[in-house]
Amino acid sequence: MKVILKEDFINLGREGDTVEVRDGFARNYLLPKGFAVFSNKHNVEIFNQKRRSILKKQETKKQIANDLKSKLDLVKLEFFMKSNDSGKLFHSINSLNIAEELFKLGFDIERKKIDIHHGTLKTFGTYDVTIKLYEGISSIIKVEIKKEEKQEDKKPLNKKLNKVDEQAERERV
């Protein structure tokens, strides 16, 4: 079945493109959700008239994606995770965790645009994560998973710091 897309679809086409899809996909998903319309003479004429505005909109999206790429290339995310004694993480990092951290930094990135090559990150280390922004435009951010120090480890360190502070205080007086 031929349909005309009303918005961009990854691996399918861009807004205004006439594409051939399976009947069930068109009837059960694209048409009811308003993502596409039937490709008939009337709809083709309407989209031909809108072609300039569609091209201008695509150029704007491309420019926004390039600006976002330049900002995202500077981002490095750090996650502090708990692990067992052998170093295995209790919780893995997935695209949702990365999307939430990016949102905290002011980037509104959809989860489906984040591509973790291994699916989830399950061990300590530094990883490259690809974010697909627009056709052919993607950004690679660094994601580092570090070990969260246990409370027991922090207490002696704080006591040592307090002793150093007390000695410095005595020397001032």
Swiss-Prot record:
This is Large ribosomal subunit protein bL9. HAMAP family: Ribosomal_bL9. The keyword Ribonucleoprotein applies. Pfam families: Ribosomal_L9_C, Ribosomal_L9_N. Residues 148-173 are annotated as: Disordered. InterPro entries: Ribosomal_bL9 (IPR000244), Ribosomal_bL9/RNase_H1_N (IPR009027), Ribosomal_bL9_bac/chp (IPR020594), Ribosomal_bL9_C (IPR020069), Ribosomal_bL9_C_sf (IPR036791), Ribosomal_bL9_N (IPR020070), Ribosomal_bL9_N_sf (IPR036935). It comes from Borreliella afzelii (strain PKo). GO terms for cellular component: ribonucleoprotein complex; ribosome.
